[in-house]
Amino acid sequence: ISVRLVGSEMCIRDRVATDNDLDDSIMAGYSFQIDLNTSFTGEDSLDISLDAGNAGAAGIAEFDGNGGGDKLTVDGVSYTFPVGGATVFVGDNSDGSSLFTTACVYGGPSNTLDDCANVNAGITGGDIAAGASYDFGNGFTVATGMQTSQEVLTEESLDGVALNAAYTGENYGVSLTYSSVETSTTEEDTATAINAYYTPEGLPSISVGYETVDIGGAASTVDEKESVFAGLTWDEVGPGSLGVALGYSNIVEGSDEEYM
């Protein structure tokens, strides 16, 4: 069994929207995750994630830490195994996009930018999830995933399904992701995201992403929303890496963009 411990964070942030002598505060939060991994055959993997933290508080929630109220919880259980030439997974409290390839090399603490604009198409947060992927061996990969919040694929359940295709070259990659997620028994949202990255020699890598969502059941003037992302990453800056990014997430048509 292998064990991996990740995460701790602190943020300084203004908690009050007004501008006065009492609007500044220092906030500290913590978050950690223990990943337990084991294999029965050498080709499969049983993964269990244990989380704790208070990082869901206002002011630091953007850092996407664990906000379980200082309680240790089982965040997810999944099992990945080969079937023929494909890879299959099933999980509880897992993401239907677990086997997807998103063409983005940027990584950062911000929840808004870390998704690289693939916010809704790469389905996440399902109670029950399953998926499969296939690697053609020439840079092309395809994957599919599903997730549900109640009974599996029944008329009463709210299900989500998604498809992903990607190509990874020597120093670049592109991916396309599509999803259809039921928001009620009669309506569904459909999302399409395209991502790409390029890593030139001696220069920072470039990652871009764009997603558009058709909101089922909404009025025609507000039935679309979009996410946009662009980021640069320097791989070797001292002992680590450095990244800068700009973008916005889930902006409904007709609304002003709120860049981060």
Residue ranges and their predicted role:
Residues I1-L5, M10-I12:
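Short, small-residue-biased leader/transition segments that mark boundaries at the very start
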Residues R13-N20:
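Short glycine/proline- and aromatic-enriched beta-strand/turn motifs that initiate or cap beta-hairpins
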Residues N20-T148, A166-T168, W234-D235, P239-G243, ...:
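Outer membrane beta-barrel
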Residues A57-A58, S98-F100, V152-L153, S184-T186, ...:
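Extracytoplasmic/secreted cell-surface and envelope-processing proteins
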Residues E156-Y259:
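Detector for outer-membrane/organellar transmembrane beta-barrel domains
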